[in-house]
Curated annotation (Swiss-Prot):
Protein localization: Cytoplasm
Gene Ontology molecular functions: ATP binding; UDP-N-acetylmuramate-L-alanine ligase activity
Biological role stated in the UniProt entry: Cell wall formation.
Protein name: UDP-N-acetylmuramate--L-alanine ligase
Spans through the membrane: none
Native species: Burkholderia vietnamiensis (strain G4 / LMG 22486)
Signal peptide location: none
GO cellular component terms, A-Z: cytoplasm
Xref: PANTHER family: UDP-N-ACETYLMURAMATE--L-ALANINE LIGASE (PTHR43445:SF3), UDP-N-ACETYLMURAMATE--L-ALANINE LIGASE-RELATED (PTHR43445)
UniProt-listed Enzyme Commission number(s): 6.3.2.8
Gene3D superfamilies per record: Mur ligase, C-terminal domain, Mur-like, catalytic domain, NAD(P)-binding Rossmann-like Domain
InterPro entries, A to Z: Mur-like_cat_sf (IPR036565), Mur_ligase_C (IPR004101), Mur_ligase_C_dom_sf (IPR036615), Mur_ligase_cen (IPR013221), Mur_ligase_N (IPR000713), MurCDEF_pg_biosynth (IPR050061), UDP-N-AcMur_Ala_ligase_MurC (IPR005758)
EC supergroup of this enzyme: ligase
Length: 465
């Protein structure tokens, strides 16, 4: 590619999926430019690495580009897309550019409705501890690396494979992980769950004859597609028929202690520096891959025990003063689907037994809120106190029967929790200040703008102090 394409432009370069690819390309020596609607820490980092960043979208931004990279979130009437089309500059989907990177190395692609980012981070961390120095492209910031991407010198590239727009079918990795299959982004699949499962089967058909599919057999939908996978399969999970299995699981002090059982290997005692059974499953995927690639047990144990997590995945902000003179524990999480939320709430209950759990939740997308409405009501009813915001639209038109007010009314009808409804995330810090008490565990959750709330709370605390 490099002898033809010198300058690559990204429309929406600050996004989680785009920025990692851009960073790897910068480090490979390409001229990289990009635009986004606002400046953030990601765009600042890319600029410091040498990328040319423009705030706002304008036709002039693509000047000199040999290719323009877009995601499915970029509208066809974007001025940079229109300019590229007019100038006959190739417009490349994000997943296609990721596929080009995978051609340079041996790809390890992590797919699944939930857990992709954490699992990708765990795989990258364990392989790095084993001396394989992988390249990685992650949908969140790997805290130990301070970035969501890195160009390694090793043979492997570890990346998320996105099923939300079916773009993972552009990838041709040598190892695939499927964490789970759940009903999300169903507009892509015509609201046909069978089509979604078929897409995952087709994903495994991208593997070479020497490749392998590493799949979580605890998920019933994953288990259903195994007979249709024609390539070698490695089963992981808590189930009795898993080839890489966790036993003797014990949650202590926010960590998961367990024993790994692998066919033909001695049992391996592991301490995972993350809470929750779902993270035990994510770690098992990393252990399965690392074992297959010859990473030592010592390196596996060290990487998991010292894993510092991923930004916005049960990210701890420490202790914050409460209005009653005590303090509460503040945590932030990206969860935005009821299944993810339930897993995070269960992890919090396990990590902080007996403590009151307060959730500040911003629903993400009206269509998801509509499609999963009853499930949202059920999972939100399991917390002890709730601050609820209006739905983060993500470009969608509002749906009156699936907005924050409708969700609040439904929760009050069920009667297990009385939500405090606020119109915007700017109101969340004040609302939490009134709700949170000494000893509480407070979680801010959602895939939208609520991610900026914890830092704002900490900043407010420092200013008062």
């Amino acid at each position: 590619m490099k002898h033809i394409v010198k300058h690559i432009h990204f429309v929406g370069i600050g996004g989680a999926g785009m920025s990692g690819i851009a960073e790897v390309l910068v480090n490979l020596g390409y001229e990289v430019s990009g635009s986004d609607l606002s400046r953030n820490a990601v765009t600042d980092r890319l600029a410091a690495l040498g990328a040319r960043i423009a705030i706002g979208h304008d036709a002039a931004n693509i000047e000199g580009a040999n290719a323009v990279v877009v995601s499915t979130a970029v509208r066809s009437d974007n001025p940079e897309v229109l300019a590229a089309r007019h100038q006959r500059v190739p417009i490349v989907q994000r997943a296609v550019m990721l596929a080009e990177l995978m051609r340079l190395k041996q790809g390890i692609a992590i797919a699944g409705t939930h857990g992709k980012t954490t699992t990708t981070s765990l795989v990258a961390s364990v392989l790095a501890a084993g001396g394989l120095d992988p390249t990685f492209v992650i949908g969140g910031r790997l805290i130990s690396a301070g970035a969501n991407a890195r160009l390694g010198t090793g043979d492997f590239i570890v990346a998320e494979a996105d099923e939300s727009d079916a773009s993972f079918l552009n990838l041709y990795p040598v190892i695939e992980v499927i964490t789970n299959i759940d009903a999300d982004h169903m507009d892509t699949y015509g609201h046909d769950f069978a089509r979604l499962k078929q897409a995952f089967i087709e994903f495994t058909q991208r593997l070479p004859f020497y490749g392998s599919a590493v799949v979580c057999v605890d998920d019933p939908n994953v288990r259903q597609i195994i007979p249709f996978i024609s390539k070698p399969v490695v089963r992981y999970g808590l189930s009795a028929d898993a080839q890489v299995r966790a036993e003797n699981i014990d949650a202590r002090d926010g960590r998961m202690h367990f024993t790994v059982i692998r066919e033909g290997r001695s049992p391996l005692a592991v301490v995972l520096n993350l809470p929750g059974l779902h993270n035990v499953q994510n770690a098992l995927a990393a252990i399965a891959i690392a074992t297959d690639l010859g990473v030592s047990d010592d390196a596996i144990q060290l990487a998991l025990a010292e894993f510092n997590g991923v930004g916005r995945r049960f990210q701890r902000y420490g202790e914050v003063p409460s209005a009653d003179g005590g303090q509460y524990t503040l945590i932030d999480d990206y969860g935005h689907h009821p299944v993810e939320m339930a897993a995070t709430i269960a992890a919090a209950r396990g990590a902080f037994p007996g403590r009151r759990l307060v959730l500040a939740f911003q629903p993400h997308r009206y269509t998801r809120t509509r499609d999963c409405f009853d499930d949202f009501v059920n999972v939100l009813s399991t917390v002890d106190a709730l601050v609820l915001t209006e739905v983060y639209a993500a470009g969608e038109a509002a749906i009156a029967t699936a907005n924050g007010d409708a969700l609040s009314r439904a929760l009050r009808t069920v009667g297990k929790v009385d939500p405090v409804f606020v119109a915007t995330v700017d109101d969340v810090p004040d609302a939490l200040a009134k709700v949170a008490r000494n000893g509480d565990v407070v979680i801010t959750m959602g895939a939208g703008s609520i991610g900026g709330v914890p830092a704002k709370i900490v900043q407010n605390t420092q200013q008062k102090g």
